[in-house]
Design a protein with these regions (language model features):
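Conserved hydrolase catalytic core segment
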Residues: 1-25
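Alpha/beta-hydrolase
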Residues: 43, 47-120
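Alpha-helical membrane-targeting segments
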Residues: 17-37, 41-42
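Conserved loop-alpha-helix segment in the C-terminal half of the alpha/beta-hydrolase fold
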Residues: 109-151
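Short aromatic-enriched loop/helix-cap "lid" or pocket-rim segments at secondary-structure transitions
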Residues: 21-26, 133-135, 160
């Protein structure tokens, strides 16, 4: 809103677009019981330090969220998300930070309806974030080009080539002069 002339379009990958009725409930629940939701407890309670990158990889490999992520992409994530310490490796961002992000879900609906630039959204067909109700609502907004991939919320790691192709195609819809 501060400098709309700097934005020619938006490309969003499985964005957190929560159904408004659930959004109101979740915001209230996070205020009343900030430590109770499973998502919060999981973020705070999971290990954040490992003896090495291999141990971190093995931990994530056993998690449902990473089931459809190839070994290569999972190791890329591990290497990017962890920093070496004198005791091994640790996540670059703490569980407390992750919990804070979960406690403050965005309400993008008004912005999506009033934006003046093209919005390209790629959602995962098996995503827990873009539910069928949310997908239908995204499809109903005229300036949104909504597409899906057979993937979950981690679609850039599950389908990296297809995701990159979507982004490149979206960027290619604007001339070089528009993007500079």
């Amino acid at each position: 809103k501060a400098a709309p002339d700097l934005v020619k379009g938006v490309v969003a990958l499985d964005p957190v677009t929560i159904d408004p009725s659930f959004l109101a409930f979740s915001r209230l629940a996070f205020r009343l019981w900030p430590e109770r939701p499973q998502l919060i407890r999981g973020a705070i309670g999971r290990p954040h330090r490992f003896s090495d990158h291999g141990a971190a990889f093995n931990f994530y490999r056993g998690k449902r969220a990473f089931t459809d992520v190839s070994d290569k992409e999972l190791m890329d994530y591990v290497l990017a998300a962890h920093v070496a310490t004198s005791e091994g490796v640790e996540l670059r961002f703490s569980g407390a930070w992750e919990a804070c992000v979960y406690r403050s879900p965005p309400n993008l609906w008004r912005t999506l309806k009033t934006t003046k630039v093209p919005v390209h959204v790629l959602g995962g067909e098996r995503s827990y974030v873009i539910t069928p109700k949310v997908a239908n609502r995204l499809r109903s907004i005229k300036q949104i080009d909504f597409r899906t991939l057979d993937a979950g919320h981690l679609l850039p790691m599950e389908k990296p080539q297809e995701t990159a192709g979507f982004v490149i195609n979206c960027l290619g819809q604007h001339s070089d002069s528009e993007l500079s």
